[in-house]
A protein has these predicted regions:
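P-loop NTPase catalytic phosphate-binding loop
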Residues: 1-28, 33-164, 183-253, 257-271, ...
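Intrinsically disordered, low-complexity mixed-charge segments
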Residues: 314-317
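Juxtamembrane/interfacial segments at transmembrane-helix boundaries in multi-pass membrane proteins
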Residues: 165-169
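Conserved alpha-helical scaffold flanking the Walker A/P-loop in AAA+ ATPase domains
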Residues: 171-183, 214
Length: 320
């Protein structure tokens, strides 16, 4: 046996050992959905590193039981997809809960699109809302136009202050009052689409243009968009939209084609449902996990606590 044969044998042994190690590691993985529900405050306490996140988002636990909390501001936008009843709205509830429990309305404001009219009744008079929960397509289209103008206004204001982004602007050490109404700080804005398909069906081209324009430029302005949908065809999730939504979160899909639409890979069709997800941040590897769950009672308590602490919402004066 010459040296080449020995090297080949060693490589084969190393490969076999790696496979065994992976199988042993897989034995400790979370391989079935935990239907009892995982309270976000229990599985991913927002302390330490997560408290330094601009926009903390509790996803859940990964395959090995490790809590998974990400910073939405770093994604900077997210596409959420999966079949009906597989965990998308519960996931968005977790996002909102994490934001309102750690950030004040001066730090983050929310815009929520709820075409079903019933998914976000629990939000009520949440002080973090920048506008009342939006339930009509025409109103959401107007809100997107307003958001586009707000983005441009912020970027011009940042440039005038010699700042490249919202972090630089809010972190200015010395601020001289220019007398032009420039605020000391501005809040992040998180826009949540609970079901994007309805809007694309009625106002497809303009919505695609606006959302693509905003997502392409809004990171510096502190505006972040989360698009969720159960309709995963090319008329709803277009190539232009996908290119500007680098964060991907897939719940169980009907087919491998739907899986590829969300995460550019197969696998979501084999998930169990009930919050079982695959997550990819930009070009990183897929991470499987079990989504966080917060009960309606807990959500109501969070809203009541926010109202008690910050008062009633101060909506923007956006006129149609």
């Amino acid at each position: 046996m010459d040296n080449r044969d020995v090297i080949a044998k060693l490589r084969e042994c190393a490969k076999n050992l790696l496979e065994v190690a992976r199988e042993m590691q897989a034995a400790d993985r979370v391989e079935s959905p935990q239907t009892a529900g995982l309270i976000a405050s229990e599985i991913a306490p927002l302390d330490g590193k997560a408290h330094n996140f601009a926009l903390p988002f509790v996803l859940g636990r990964d395959e090995f039981g490790t809590s998974q909390t990400i910073d939405l501001a770093l994604l900077p936008h997210l596409l959420v997809g999966g079949g009906a009843g597989r965990g998308k709205t519960v996931c968005l509830n977790s996002l909102i809960a994490g934001l309102i429990s750690t950030k004040s309305p001066d730090e983050v404001r929310l815009m929520i699109y709820d075409p079903k009219c019933v998914e976000y009744t629990w939000v009520g008079e949440l002080p973090h809302l920048i506008l009342p929960v939006i339930t009509s397509d025409s109103r959401m289209l107007f809100a997107l136009r307003w958001l586009d103008c707000e983005m441009e206004k912020r970027l011009k204001m940042f440039a005038k202050s010699y700042c490249r982004n919202i972090t630089d602007f809010n972190g200015r050490k010395f601020v001289q009052d220019a007398g032009d109404g420039t605020p000391r700080t501005v809040p992040y804005i998180v826009v949540v689409f609970d079901e994007f398909a309805d809007l694309m069906t009625t106002h497809g081209k303009e919505v695609e243009t606006l959302v693509s324009r905003i997502t392409a430029k809004a990171r510096a302005a502190g505006i972040h968009i989360v698009v969720a949908t159960s309709r995963l065809d090319c008329k709803v999730v277009t190539g232009l939209l996908k290119s500007n939504l680098p964060g991907r979160l897939a719940f169980k899909t009907v087919s491998s084609i739907d899986s590829r639409t969300i995460i550019d890979d197969v696998g979501a069709e084999n998930l169990y449902g009930c919050g079982d997800y695959l997550f990819r941040s930009s070009s990183e590897e897929l991470v499987r996990g079990q989504g966080a769950y917060i009960s309606d009672v807990e959500l109501g308590q969070l809203v009541s606590a926010a109202i008690g602490k910050y008062g009633q919402p101060k909506y923007e004066e956006a006129k149609e």
